[in-house]
Amino acid sequence: MATVKKKLDAGQFNLKDQVVAINRVTKVVKGGKNLSFAALVVVGDPSAAVVGYGSGKAKEVPQAIRKGIESAKKNLVKVNLSQTSIPHQVLGRYGSGRVMLKPAPEGTGVIAGGAVRAVMTSAGVQNVLTKSIGTTNPHNVIKATFEALKQLRDRREVAAGRGKTVEEL
């Protein structure tokens, strides 16, 4: 049976936004070309380990970014952290994209590129090793990263699932 996660309220967090990609799109019509912009935005509160992503489309770049931020605030995810890193290694898949997240010792930093780095820093992860495999499309890379983050379980959740205490693990 699937568990229902409660929706996180964006108002209770100090969210910082980060633009991952801006795409200029042209639609050819009878009278010429219509220009518009699409923005991919990641928002997060590093102190609360909350992160979300969204995309916005508009005729101007600032409006597209604003719409992306509003969209990102609607799908926030709580990230399970173990001190400054992630608790265990995970592999997120979306489309042809694969993103591997691996815990790292203190002082390593965020070893990630592009879209994955934006998600990790926004989520408050300070030490992690990542590898993005397959697609370079930032939309699919971010979605694969979020699939990986949703798989993270801390020691208490694992112990509860096995019917044991944390000390028994």
UniProtKB/Swiss-Prot annotation:
Keywords: Ribonucleoprotein, Ribosomal protein, RNA-binding, rRNA-binding. GO terms for biological process: translation. InterPro entries: Ribosomal_Su5_D2-typ_SF, Ribosomal_uS5, Ribosomal_uS5_bac-type, Ribosomal_uS5_C, Ribosomal_uS5_N, Ribsml_uS5_D2-typ_fold_subgr. GO terms for cellular component: small ribosomal subunit. Residues 15-79 form the S5 DRBM domain. Pfam families: Ribosomal_S5, Ribosomal_S5_C. One of its GO terms (molecular function) is rRNA binding. Belongs to the universal ribosomal protein uS5 family. The N-terminal domain interacts with the head of the 30S subunit; the C-terminal domain interacts with the body and contacts protein S4. The interaction surface between S4 and S5 is involved in control of translational fidelity. NCBIfam families: rpsE_bact. With S4 and S12 plays an important role in translational accuracy. Located at the back of the 30S subunit body where it stabilizes the conformation of the head with respect to the body. Part of the 30S ribosomal subunit. Contacts proteins S4 and S8. This is Small ribosomal subunit protein uS5. The lineage of its organism: Bacteria, Pseudomonadati, Acidobacteriota, Terriglobia, Terriglobales.
